[in-house]
């Protein structure tokens, strides 16, 4: 019995890409915020880089990612409900606190 997956099985195992053309601008910005936050956690050294399975700490890049998140959240804040704004503000605070801790 062949244990290697067939091409159709490989296709089924791959995650489906998000169809971004159906997202409005605010949803796109929220997606960017989530992508930037993942990168920020990696750059401040608290998440493993999935490509290398290593911690690749780069605090300068982490700071840029956090600053971009702040800017994006400030830009879309008036279009979000209070719960979503609070969630994003907590994310920013968590990133900032952990960034400072990693600088020590």
Locations of regions flagged by a protein language model:
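A charge-rich, low-complexity, intrinsically flexible signal that marks solvent-exposed coils, linkers
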Residues: 2-104
